[in-house]
């Protein structure tokens, strides 16, 4: 049936109704849903069909016959090939409206109890929605004899060289470009995944926005590092802002960028960052939000939603280096946090000690294993804050929360679909007070949401 409606290679005219979760335009052709990246709501476009399935088809934008008033010219020269951003062609105010609408779409799909009456607050955006990312993680490739660093084109392993990413902090761009020049100067062997040869796979550069400290991580196929001393000396001479040089070994066939072994090459083993007057040490593998300016906004919204009293205890699930929990520690009687990465827990403990915070307890493990264990031991928290990965809450953790729900909960989500799915369960024991979206990643389709929940 679908094959008769539309064929691969066919050119069709479409009216775009809305944007999908990846920022792509959505239209209907003879009742078949068509996804067209780059198209905007209220536009009339021509698209060429590239993929057909029984339930939907995908197309590439050929021309815009009637443009939306919110369409703007993307300032990035590689915007259409890079795949890192999805919304540069949409005016920023409209991006904020879209992110609130995404949340509405997800709730409509999963229909948690009473969802039509949820309070959805306006998305909090940035004054300057550019140059916000504190970390660049660029793949390396030898192209025509030259080392290039960049990102893979969407759904491919085709590298798009990038020497000025408009959403990156300028400090990371400067360091990245200098490192690429040095790799070329020293003619170091770049990893080739087809031949499984070479050494240098990826460069990671992270900057502490408040401190100006920069960390460089060379991600390599093996522990080998030809001309290591020369490279370190050159970085010292040309990039005095770099205070930490590390090497991470990733020799497995996996989509994970980093491996388990991290080697210290020079300087400090971590860099400092400040959020809400709390100082954090960031080691190479430690998770830390990519937009520190909006992270402060996000966590302040979380703190406000929790409304902790001095006698209350709180669990910081998925705690990372302790960013949320340490921001809460002043207001709470005790904070307990957990994370699966031992280095992150080490950082969280160190951060607490350095700040003189004595009312925290950090443990290595999953929230779904540790929370039931703590419940059995008699620790019954008054509040819990969860900041899970994009996959949402683990089923075992949800079960534990449904059995013994703390009286207050804040859910910080980076994926509106898994949030809406989890709210179906959480709404059985919690009232959803409000949802506050925060734009952590301007120019992309991603959005963070703070949800305030109170036990029924």
From Swiss-Prot:
Origin superkingdom: Bacteria
A GO biological process this protein is involved in? rRNA base methylation
Tell me which UniProt keywords the record has, alphabetically. 4Fe-4S, Iron, Iron-sulfur, Metal-binding, Methyltransferase, S-adenosyl-L-methionine, Transferase
Q: Its Gene Ontology molecular function terms?
A: 4 iron, 4 sulfur cluster binding; metal ion binding; rRNA (uridine-C5-)-methyltransferase activity
Documented EC number(s): 2.1.1.-
Pfam families for this protein: TRAM (PF01938), tRNA_U5-meth_tr (PF05958)
Specify whether Methyltransferase is a keyword of the entry: yes
Family per record? Belongs to the class I-like SAM-binding methyltransferase superfamily. RNA M5U methyltransferase family.
**Protein name, UniProt field:** Uncharacterized RNA methyltransferase EF_2706
Which lineage ranks, top first, belong to the organism behind this chain? Bacteria, Bacillati, Bacillota, Bacilli, Lactobacillales
């Amino acid at each position: 049936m679908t094959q008769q409606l539309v064929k691969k290679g066919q050119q069709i005219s479409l009216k775009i109704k809305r944007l999908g979760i990846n920022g792509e335009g959505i239209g209907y052709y003879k009742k078949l849903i068509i996804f067209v990246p780059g198209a905007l709501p209220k536009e009339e476009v021509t698209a060429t069909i590239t993929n057909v399935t029984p339930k939907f088809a995908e197309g590439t934008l050929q021309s815009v016959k009637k443009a939306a008033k919110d369409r703007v010219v993307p300032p990035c020269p590689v915007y259409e090939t890079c795949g890192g951003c999805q919304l540069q062609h949409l005016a920023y105010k409209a991006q904020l409206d879209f992110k609130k609408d995404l949340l509405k779409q997800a709730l409509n799909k999963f229909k948690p109890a009473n969802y039509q009456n949820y309070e959805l607050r306006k998305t909090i955006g940035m004054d300057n929605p550019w140059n916000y990312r504190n970390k660049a993680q660029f793949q390396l490739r030898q192209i025509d004899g030259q080392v290039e660093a960049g990102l893979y084109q969407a759904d491919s392993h085709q590298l798009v060289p990038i020497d000025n990413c408009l959403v990156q902090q300028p400090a990371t761009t400067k360091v990245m470009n200098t490192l690429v020049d040095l790799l070329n100067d020293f003619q170091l062997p770049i990893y080739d995944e087809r031949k499984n040869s070479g050494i240098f796979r990826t460069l990671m550069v992270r900057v502490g926005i408040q401190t100006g400290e920069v960390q460089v991580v060379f991600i390599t196929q093996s522990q080998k590092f030809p001309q290591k001393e020369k490279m370190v000396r050159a970085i010292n001479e040309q990039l005095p802002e770099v205070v930490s040089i590390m090497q991470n070994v990733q020799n497995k066939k996996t989509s994970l960028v980093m491996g388990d072994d991290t080697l210290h090459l020079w300087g400090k083993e971590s860099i400092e960052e400040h959020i809400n007057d709390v100082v954090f040490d960031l080691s190479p593998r430690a998770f830390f939000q990519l937009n520190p300016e909006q992270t402060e906004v996000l966590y302040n919204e979380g703190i406000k939603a929790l409304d902790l009293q001095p006698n209350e205890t709180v669990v910081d699930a998925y705690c990372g280096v302790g960013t949320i929990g340490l921001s809460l520690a002043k207001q709470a009687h005790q904070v307990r946090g957990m994370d699966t990465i031992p280095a992150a827990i080490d950082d969280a403990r160190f951060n607490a000690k350095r700040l003189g915070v004595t009312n925290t307890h950090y443990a290595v493990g999953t929230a779904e294993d540790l929370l039931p264990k703590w419940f059995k031991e008699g620790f019954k928290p008054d509040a819990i804050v969860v900041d899970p990965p994009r996959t949402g809450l683990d089923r075992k953790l949800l079960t534990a929360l449904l059995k013994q729900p703390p009286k207050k909960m804040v859910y910080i989500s980076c994926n509106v679909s898994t949030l809406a799915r989890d709210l179906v369960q959480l709404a059985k024991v919690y009232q959803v007070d409000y949802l506050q979206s925060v734009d952590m990643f301007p120019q992309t389709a991603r959005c963070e949401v703070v949800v305030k929940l109170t036990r029924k």
